[in-house]
Amino acid sequence: MAVGKNKRISKGKKGGKKKAADPFSKKDWYDIKAPSLFITRNVGKTLVTRTQGTKIASEGLKHRVFEVSLADLQNDEDHSYRKIRLRAEDVQGKNVLTNFWGMDVTTDKLRSLVKKWQSLIEAHVDVKTTDNFTLRMFCIGFTKKRANQVKRTCYAQSSQIKQIRRKMREIMVTQAQTCDLKELVQKFIPESIGREIEKATSSIYPLQNVFIRKVKILKAPKFDIGKLMEVHGDYSEDVGVKLDRPAEEAAPEATEVIGA
């Protein structure tokens, strides 16, 4: 009988099976802080691998983009169709300080606006704010029936659409060029630009549901910690308070010992 390996006899491997390490044991949670122009400042939490050698945790967090519903930021369900993008700019302690990085409208809201018997008018323009942010703003609007109109449809002529589009661009440029990014975001929240476009174009053709549907940041200025702290307003890191020592507990004066 030939001598060989008996396959039926299983031998134990050296060292045994390695225990799988929990990947979360090497990670830390950080709080995401929204700018002070929003009511809710604590957006949520994010994970990052702890600092190991040359890999610094804070560097891995910078420039992360978080998408948050405006309803959560403003504690108002009326804003649930808006999505705000926030980008991580700096890390202080366990807090990630963010800044506005774009805006969008949910798909279901956009689909609900598009209907028959009306004209859809869109315009977009590139603008630069006073603090050197370059943005691309997209506007959308729909025609509506005039007062006492019997006709079922409310289609605008191509010449009227061109005029309305020109007016949309003009208003978006004037509104953005005269303020900084923080002030511009404060105009987006109550949809004041959309209402102004409705008023300005009413003489050409009455409009309804005029929205700044999307905002993209094309170019941002060089990072400045001072500007970021202005955006976050009253934010300050948790530090100890300096206490005054009572007069009777004054530190003893140092005495020099001669010959020591």
Swiss-Prot record:
Keywords: Cytoplasm, Ribonucleoprotein, Ribosomal protein. GO terms for molecular function: structural constituent of ribosome. Residues 1-22 are annotated as: Disordered. SMART domains: Ribosomal_S3Ae (SM01397). GO terms for cellular component: cytosolic small ribosomal subunit. Pfam families: Ribosomal_S3Ae. It is found in: Cytoplasm. Residues 1-18 have a biased composition (Basic residues). Component of the small ribosomal subunit. Mature ribosomes consist of a small (40S) and a large (60S) subunit. The 40S subunit contains about 33 different proteins and 1 molecule of RNA (18S). The 60S subunit contains about 49 different proteins and 3 molecules of RNA (25S, 5.8S and 5S). HAMAP family: Ribosomal_eS1_euk. Belongs to the eukaryotic ribosomal protein eS1 family. This is Small ribosomal subunit protein eS1. It comes from Helianthus annuus. The lineage of its organism: Eukaryota, Viridiplantae, Streptophyta, Embryophyta, Tracheophyta. The gene is RPS3A.
